[in-house]
Amino acid sequence: MNQLFLHCRPGFEKECAAEITELAAAQGIYGYSKTKDNAAFVVFITQDERGAETLIRQLPFQSLIFVRQWFAGFGNLSDLPVTDRVSPLLEAARALPKTSDLTGETVDTNEGKALSALVKKFLLPFGKALDAHKCLDRKSPWRLHLVFLSGTEAYLGVAPVNNSSAWPMGIPRLRLPKSAPSRATLKLEEAWHHFIPAADWDRRLAPGMRAVDLGAAPGGWTWQLVQRSIYVEAIDNGPMDKDLLDSGLVTHVLADGFLFEPKKPVDWLVCDIVDKPARVSSMVIKWFSKGHCRQAIFNLKLPMKQRYMEVQKCRTRILGELGSLGMRAELDFKQLYHDREEVTGYLRVF
């Protein structure tokens, strides 16, 4: 397998391509990317005939920023006969490793979403054909991915179950709670799902912890913390949701988020302030260097150009400055589904 299919946010194809090219080279694997603006996917073609398979095994999916989901294969299948798409796709599947499951996908564009009904309808007969030809093995570490780009073109490939997103297309199925003050609440929930293993939630998001939410109004992120019974200082000059204030867990502080500092250390810092990445990075460094918190989730609003480079610059600076203070830190970034022109960072120190 020499081709990697990479789902990404529409408009971030160049960042996705730059990232996979750099990370692949670090693994000694070289190739080139095929991109199209706003297509919501990138295809990375390796020089080595097994380069994509090696990459998807060795490169930690968790380390990828702009890639929502990925799988390795041999390339696209075009001119699929409308009357029998199963036969050519079955032939392609038989050249791949046996898989434990089948996932049907589109790309995250309006054109892609229009194919959702086709994908859903096709999965049943295709799944039966795979089963009949012994292409499925419930114990296999691989998952089979099928992406339709049109009614006659598709990509087919495999991804390691333990080194890929658990969600089709890398898009979590989260529902907006009726009582949440804003849609931004889903961003923090998705961040927790991505950065913190489910088995660690009770320990790292424990009831009774204390958090500071910078730029909190009207309270989307604070709402998530309150649902975990975490005490929150909500810092914002704007108004907060009344029900949150009545919960007994929230203290609203009228202040500038960049100037506020807690009187005592807290467990969590969360920040969704719209500002330059360098300024947000400085604030995060200040909080950790002064011992104000041990964990943080924050957003970096990206510039129009050199967005991947900007994230890498912020990463290098944060880790470098904390490292110079003798602090051992873990820092990950991800462009979440609920992010827009931004990435979300998770930082903790040990």
Curated annotation (Swiss-Prot):
Catalytic activity: cytidine(2498) in 23S rRNA + S-adenosyl-L-methionine = 2'-O-methylcytidine(2498) in 23S rRNA + S-adenosyl-L-homocysteine + H(+)
Active site: 301
Residues that hold S-adenosyl-L-methionine according to the record: 217-220, 236, 256, 272
Principal subcellular localization: cytoplasm
Alphabetized UniProt keyword annotations: Cytoplasm, Methyltransferase, rRNA processing, S-adenosyl-L-methionine, Transferase
EC number(s) recorded for this UniProt protein: 2.1.1.186
Molecular-function annotations in GO: S-adenosylmethionine-dependent methyltransferase activity
Compartments it resides in: Cytoplasm
One Gene Ontology term from the biological process aspect of the record: rRNA processing
Gene3D superfamilies linked: 3.30.2300.20, 3.30.70.2810, Vaccinia Virus protein VP39 (3.40.50.150)
Class of this enzyme: transferase
Source taxon at top rank: Bacteria
Gene Ontology cellular component terms for the protein in this record: cytoplasm
Record field: transmembrane: none
HAMAP family (alphabetical): 23SrRNA_methyltr_M (MF_01551)
Entry similarity comment: Belongs to the class I-like SAM-binding methyltransferase superfamily. RNA methyltransferase RlmE family. RlmM subfamily.
Function comment: Catalyzes the 2'-O-methylation at nucleotide C2498 in 23S rRNA.
Assembly behavior: Monomer.
NCBIfam families found in the cross-reference section: PRK11760.1 (NF008734)
Full protein name: Ribosomal RNA large subunit methyltransferase M
Organism the protein comes from: Cellvibrio japonicus (strain Ueda107)
